[in-house]
Each structure stands twice: as C-alpha cells, then as structure tokens.
UniProtKB/Swiss-Prot annotation:
Top class in the EC scheme: transferase
UniProt function note: Catalyzes the formation of 5-methyl-uridine at position 747 (m5U747) in 23S rRNA.
Name of protein: 23S rRNA (uracil(747)-C(5))-methyltransferase RlmC
Highest taxon listed in the record's lineage: Bacteria
Lineage of the species this protein comes from: Bacteria, Pseudomonadati, Pseudomonadota, Gammaproteobacteria, Enterobacterales
GO biological process, one term: rRNA base methylation
Binding site for S-adenosyl-L-methionine: Q212, F241, E262, N307
InterPro entries the UniProt entry points to: 23SrRNA_MeTrfase_RlmC (IPR011825), MeTrfase_TrmA_AS (IPR030390), MeTrfase_TrmA_CS (IPR030391), SAM-dependent_MTases_sf (IPR029063), U5_MeTrfase_fam (IPR010280)
PANTHER family noted in UniProt: RNA M5U METHYLTRANSFERASE, TRNA (URACIL(54)-C(5))-METHYLTRANSFERASE
Disulfide bonds: none
A Pfam family recorded for this sequence: tRNA_U5-meth_tr
Active site: C334
C-alpha cells in the first residue's frame, strides 16, 4: 500500500507498510505458531486476509487548528498536529464528510480544543460507516455542553450536505486527558443506531458499543465461527464478552438456547434488537460482567464462546471454565499472547483447530479464532 503520509514521515501508525501483505501474513502466522508452541494443535487452518486499503469503517480524528481552519487527524507527542484525511485506510466515502465538516465547524462555532492551553470545545470527531447501506454515524466529542445550542442550530445545513448521516450525537468528555469519549451521549437525531448486516445477519451499531473496524474480515470471522459451531452437537451455548452479539447471532439456531453477556448496556441493546429481528426467541442477552455471570451459574452449556478484550479472560474465569468443563470452548482474540496464556490455564482442553484473521493489515496485530475440545 502506498501512503504519502508515511513517505513524508508524518505518520508511523502502519509500521509494517513497507512489507508486502504476504510477508505480513507469514510473519503473523509465525508469531502465532511461536505463541502456541507446546500446545498441541490438531488443525492449522489457512489464514484469512482482506483488502490492503480503504477497509476501515471508522475514523477517530483529533480536532486541532482553529475554528476557521480546523485540522482532523492526530497529535504527535510534542503537540504537532497531522492531517489524516488522506489516510489510505479510509474509504473514499469519508472524503466528502471531512470536506463538509470543515466549514460546518465554523458555522457552528465549535472551537477546536487546544491541549496546551486547555481551552476550546471540540476534541474529536468519530465517524462510522455501515457497509450494508452506506449510512453513517457521526459523534462530536465536546468538552462541555456550552456549544450544544449552536450545534443543533447548524445541523440542518450539515444534514442537507450529507444525507448519509443517519445518527449524530454529542459526547461530553470534560477531562483534560487523552480519553476518546465520556459517559454522556446526547442524541441529535431521532435514529439512535446504525444498521449493519454481515452474512444476512442484522447488526446494530450504537455510539458507545464496540464494533470491528474491518467489516470484510470481521464478516468472515463470524461466518467461520458459525461453520465451526454448526459441525458440533451444541444445544446450549454461552457467548461471553458478546458485544453487539455478532458471534451469538451468527451461531444461534431456532432450537439452540443461547445466553450472551456483555458489560456495556449499549451493546446489549443492539444485540436484543437483532435477535428480535431474526425471531430467535431462545436468545437472551444481558448487560453483566462476563466473569461474574459465569461463576454464578449452576448449569454447564455445551459450548462457551469468549471474545474478550486484549487482556484476555484471566485466570479466575479460566479456572472456573476448567472446573465447569463445557465440552467445547471457542476463543476469539485480538491478542494471541493473552489467549495463549489463558489456554495454558485450561489443561484439560486441546486445540482442535485455529485460524488467523488479518483484521489489522500493515501492523503486527491480528485476530485469531481457536476451537478447544475437552480431552477428558
């Protein structure tokens, strides 16, 4: 992938950009083999790649500069701003949005936040696009509610320029820290969730719910999990750290009893909406801590699927799963190092198959899916 920002030395986020995609996949595969060394693997499935560029469905832009000439991108550690509107990871459909937002900021009087002076209102712009219908969600991350009236008054102009904006919010983040969002979300549109669809499964994206940033590879990840579960005798399944329900909604059948657990209420609201659309009445999603939920249960499902954050599921949940002893565990991870640590805390399980998904091209990161079968 060619990137003018990288060539000019202005951005180094894609640290592997000088390597070919095949070289990157080989290096990531070797890393996964290294991390799982000593753990018997029955089947290594071929790695899954995706597009080299224009694949991201989300932009997280620091806003700097002035109200008349705002700049969208990032700040180096010394405070130097870098315009990332031309980042080749973004789809071309983002270009008109960035172009319209620059004059809009002046219209709304949204002064960019100055980190050094601790002054200004607009901190970030968060843009998400649905690959299903091209609809977009735009979030203005503000220091306070001071400019809300002006923002609301100027919105008709922006929506006339960009009818693809379905969901618009103001997120209030008052803390002088590099935190992307605050707890308060104020909806500026009637629609509150963005419709997405992977493999004919309806999904919903809300402002504070996690959603994969590479939809092409994510859809293949979910489809693979569905295929694996479909080959197993599963009538009762848990989907822990379920997010908006992507895995559970793909794997569920009308006869299956499935419980999805996620600590974020916004994500659970999305999962419930999708389950209702699919008519799956035996799916139950709850906003709870996954470890606390699991350790409080007296029943053992046939399969437990876990999709934890980078820190992994941790030893307490590993110990409980080992004691509870479901027949199968599917582990989806964005950090193979913590996944390998967790699997080593499950001594009575063998890795039946494992597959790498190149969710994050041009970086050292990748997603991995592993199917574990109880050996005794």
């Amino acid at each position: 992938m060619q990137c003018a920002l990288y060539d000019a030395g202005r951005c180094r986020s894609c640290q592997w950009i000088t390597q070919s995609v095949n070289e990157q996949l080989s290096a990531k595969t070797a890393d996964l083999h290294r991390l799982l060394a000593g753990l018997p693997v029955e089947q290594w499935c071929a790695p899954i790649g995706g597009p080299e560029q224009h694949f991201r469905n989300k932009a997280k832009m620091v806003v700097s500069g002035s109200v008349e000439k705002p700049l969208f991108g990032m700040l180096h550690r010394d405070g130097t701003p870098v315009d990332l509107c031309g980042c080749p990871l973004y789809p071309a459909s983002f270009d008109p949005v960035f172009s319209a937002l620059k004059p809009f900021i002046a219209r709304a009087g949204l002064t960019p936040y100055n980190v050094a002076r601790k002054r200004g209102e607009l901190k970030y712009l968060l843009l998400t696009e649905s690959q299903f219908d091209g609809g977009m969600m735009l979030r203005f991350v503000l220091r306070s509610e001071t400019k809300l009236t002006q923002l609301r008054a100027a919105l008709p102009w922006l929506r006339a320029q960009l009818p693809q904006l379905r969901v618009i919010t103001a997120n209030i983040q008052p803390v002088h820290m590099a935190i992307m969002e605050g707890e308060t979300e104020i909806y500026l549109t009637d629609q509150q969730a963005l419709a997405e669809r992977f493999n004919d499964v309806p999904l919903w994206i809300r402002p504070q719910s996690f959603f994969q940033t590479n939809p092409t590879v994510a859809s293949r990840l979910y489809a693979t999990a569905r295929d694996w579960v479909g080959q197993l005798p599963v009538r009762h399944m848990w989907d822990l750290f379920c997010g908006v329900g992507g895995f559970g909604l793909h794997c569920a059948t009308p006869q299956m009893q499935l419980t999805g657990i996620e600590i974020a209420p916004e994500a659970i609201a999305c999962a419930k909406q999708s389950a209702a659309e699919l008519g799956l009445t035996r799916l139950h999603f709850q906003a709870l801590d996954s470890t606390q939920f699991a350790t409080a249960q007296g029943e053992t499902p046939d399969l437990v699927l876990v999709n934890p954050p980078r820190r992994g599921i941790g030893k307490p949940l590993c110990d409980y799963l080992a004691q509870m002893a479901p027949r199968f565990i599917i582990y989806s991870s964005c950090n193979a190092q913590t996944m390998a640590q967790d699997i080593r805390h499950l001594p009575n399980y063998r890795i039946q198959r494992v597959q790498l998904f190149d969710m994050f091209p041009h970086t050292a990161h990748y997603e991995v899916l592993a199917l574990l079968r109880r050996s005794i």
